[in-house]
Curated annotation (Swiss-Prot):
3'-phosphoadenylyl sulfate binds at residues 16-20, 116, 124, 128, 170, 215-224. Belongs to the protein sulfotransferase family. Glycans are attached at N57, N136. It catalyses: L-tyrosyl-[protein] + 3'-phosphoadenylyl sulfate = O-sulfo-L-tyrosine-[protein] + adenosine 3',5'-bisphosphate + H(+). Pfam families: Sulfotransfer_3. Keywords: Disulfide bond, Glycoprotein, Transferase. It comes from the Eukaryota. GO terms for cellular component: Golgi apparatus. This is Putative protein-tyrosine sulfotransferase. Catalyzes the O-sulfation of tyrosine residues within acidic motifs of polypeptides, using 3'-phosphoadenylyl sulfate (PAPS) as cosubstrate. It comes from Caenorhabditis briggsae. Disulfide bonds join C34-C89, C158-C165.
Amino acid sequence: MLSNFEQLIFVGGVPRSGTTLMRAILDAHPDVRCGGETMLLPSFLTWQAGWRTDWVNNSGITQEVFDDAVSAFITEIIAKHGELAPRLCNKDPYTALWLPTIQRLYPNSKFILMIRDARAVIHSMIERKVPVAGYNTSDEQSMFVKWNQEIRKMLFQCNNAPGQCIKVYYERLIQKPEEEIQRITNFLDLQYSQQMLHHHELIGAEVDLNDQEFSASQVKNSINTKALTSWFDCFSEDTLRKLDDVAPFLSVLGYDTSSSKPDYSMFADDDFYQFRNFYS
């Protein structure tokens, strides 16, 4: 069995934020294996939190014992979810809500938090009929409120894990893939591989796809910018007018909420990260 000190890689974020693309890119690296979503670990992390009570401690099961049991389960799932590799990776979007727990269980792990314009995220959920708990597709504005709640918590946790969590903007990744992938591999202490720019050519070989993942069909294509503007003209004027109220973290993250057709070229600027402060 692998130890708790393995340099595991976790990829998370609000669903439809580019997590599947990110894990496909990582899977293309010769030393990394992610595989598809387990669709289990976020629920398991929620379950284990409910058992961390005084009742458990009073029964003689200390947090250390409980942590060992929890990490043993998670490690087995990740390790036997596919072929072994020098660096193992997990992509379940909502693990991003459990970063402090992951930090404690796996002190040498690294986390990639994917960030994407909420308008594109929510349009994707609605258009592709992706069922995500807590998102009511018949009420657009409530979906923006839910996104804001989740990304706020994810960002807070990521910002409290310096050196262990990196934020990756989807809009930059697809416009400046080589620079961004090099930034990511540096963070992960991996040697950069040109294969990562061509993940689509390795589908079925280095990169296994899970047909249950809603983005599986999309990542069969090369990295492209087609999805950047797919949400244009898809929201009501009333919804767009209220964005700063229902999803204030859009502007905090640098997205232009004043335009119904924003220009994403700023995310490709060479000095982009110089202007990312607490939330970047």
